[in-house]
Amino acid sequence: MSRADEGRLIHLAKKREREKEDIEQQLRKLEEDKEKCRVGITNKFMANYETVEEVVKSKTYGLVSLDDMKNIQKNEISNRDLQVARGDQSSSTQSKDSQEAREKEEHVAKHTQKRFLSFAFDDEEDEEDAAPIIPKKRVGMDPTVDTSFLPDKEREEFLRKKKESLAAEWRVKQDAEKNEEITVAYAYWDGSSHRKNMKIKKGNTISQCLGRAIEALKKEFTELKSCTAENLMFVKEDLIIPHFYTFQDFIVTKAMGKTGPLFVFDSASDVRIRQDAALDYGESHPAKIVLRSWYEKNKHIYPASRWEPFVPSKKYGRNFDDLSDL
């Protein structure tokens, strides 16, 4: 026997048991209704009989003939029977209405109860009525609640576009500033100062500045004819500046050296940032261009002894040895 046949037999056995229980329940209900009717009729007749006797006694005063007594009793019994008939009709109507209401409630309860797991076949389940779908009510949202922390695609897209536009605007502004020309004062240092000026763009690197300085100085100094930018050092405010930095980097960040700001090109009237500075922007120290070979030979001698590589994260300031420059 296959599993499908076993399942069908189990289903049929359960169906027979349910039918048997329904028949027994109906028989019990009939017995209960029959008992109720019997008790109700007995009570009605007993109550009616007692009521008729009381009415007859109340209507007879003193000595009454037998015929009059029988007539009064007969009239009261006929009136009572008429009232009982009317009461049965109204009670039957009420019982019928209550039975219909009860059947309706049972029908609703049957169709709204939860459907449990069943091993019945699909064709047998289709015979049963489908449970009605109760639509879920949507709970309204409170407009006063802060929802800024929740993900919002429209807001995120708006912020992304705004950031991109600001970044593009910043890049355009930076490119425009990098193309601005500035005048840089520098001096070739070989133990003595040979000061010159050079016009250069803010976006140029220190290496490019050294290359242009070589072109201007090699006519006067023969040691620079075969020199390249890698053989030179750029010293500003006692700091050795790496070649990959641009002038714009120091102007924007307002980087400070040991004796003042590295580069200030805002206006000629600006006093140097440090409060203990004694010189104006126009008289600030020019940048020194030095051969590396000369520095290696003389780095123990002043002023090369005070030079050190530039570190962006380090804060530089005057020390007691710098007071001699005032």
UniProtKB/Swiss-Prot annotation:
List S-S links within the chain: none
UniProt note: phenotype after gene disruption = Reduced growth and mobility. Larval lethal.
Entry GO CC: nucleus
The annotated regions of Basic and acidic residues compositional bias extend over 97-109
Q: Name the InterPro entries on file.
A: FAM50A/XAP5_C (IPR048337), XAP5 (IPR007005)
Q: Which family does it belong to?
A: Belongs to the FAM50 family.
Name it: Protein FAM50 homolog
Q: Give the species.
A: Caenorhabditis elegans
